[in-house]
Amino acid sequence: MKNVKIALTKGRLEKKAIEIFKTININTRELEDKGRKLIFNCENEEYNIELFLVKAKDVETYVEYGAADIGIVGKDTLMETNKEFYEVLDLNVGKCKFALAALPSFKLDQGYNMKKIATKYPNIAREYFRKKGMDVELIKIEGSVELGPIVGLADAIVDIVETGNTLRENGLVVVEDICEISARMIVNKASMKTKKDEIIKIIENVSEVIRQ
């Protein structure tokens, strides 16, 4: 049984993925009391798995370069970049959406002035407005993008919306939904060949859980 390395996004998706792994009998005991550890042995009679926790944007890199065979990461991260791997499963967890949001006075089609859009996801925002045939100025922000329209930095924002509470608390409204997103499983292309049996087993078992 070949060793399979899984890169898992820290935080919210980590917890959701661990629940799925438990269901298919992957040994997650070390993850339940992890302290400051980053690498975990999840081996048992059914699986030979090594799992490590990384930031969302790094999951793709680990998988693309073969340091990880499998990755669990949000679709938002995949949409923003253009890396080489197989996207094999929608895990149906971590659901939220991309949306255009602004102050209530904002009008998307008002006037000829170029709109300023603040976002952590410039590639996604650029593609959204390209499809609308609109030229906009994109302002990349790493922190709380909701602040942009409030202080006059931007006319609107493109960001992830889960409950909408943060928008409401800051006086913003959703102007338009862009797309639904959720957690995905990705696989290194070479690993799919060299560790095919082990990886297919994981994919099939996780698929069964998702269908239930």
From Swiss-Prot:
Compartments, as annotated in UniProt: Cytoplasm
Catalytic activity: 1-(5-phospho-beta-D-ribosyl)-ATP + diphosphate = 5-phospho-alpha-D-ribose 1-diphosphate + ATP
GO molecular function per UniProt: ATP binding; ATP phosphoribosyltransferase activity
Enzyme class, UniProt record, top EC level: transferase
GO biological process, one term: L-histidine biosynthetic process
Cited Pfam families: HisG
InterPro entries: ATP_PRibTrfase_cat, ATP_PRibTrfase_CS, ATP_PRibTrfase_HisG, ATP_PRibTrfase_HisG_short
Pathway field: Amino-acid biosynthesis; L-histidine biosynthesis; L-histidine from 5-phospho-alpha-D-ribose 1-diphosphate: step 1/9
CDD domains (UniProt xref): PBP2_HisGs
GO cellular component, as recorded: cytoplasm
Primary location: cytoplasm
Keyword hit for Amino-acid biosynthesis: yes
UniProt keyword terms in alphabetical order: Amino-acid biosynthesis, ATP-binding, Cytoplasm, Glycosyltransferase, Histidine biosynthesis, Nucleotide-binding, Transferase
UniProt EC number: 2.4.2.17
Record bears the keyword Transferase: yes
Family affiliation: Belongs to the ATP phosphoribosyltransferase family. Short subfamily.
UniProt domain comment: Lacks the C-terminal regulatory region which is replaced by HisZ.
Role description: Catalyzes the condensation of ATP and 5-phosphoribose 1-diphosphate to form N'-(5'-phosphoribosyl)-ATP (PR-ATP). Has a crucial role in the pathway because the rate of histidine biosynthesis seems to be controlled primarily by regulation of HisG enzymatic activity.
Binding partners and assembly: Heteromultimer composed of HisG and HisZ subunits.
Name of the protein described by the UniProt record: ATP phosphoribosyltransferase
Organism encoding this protein: Clostridium botulinum (strain Okra / Type B1)
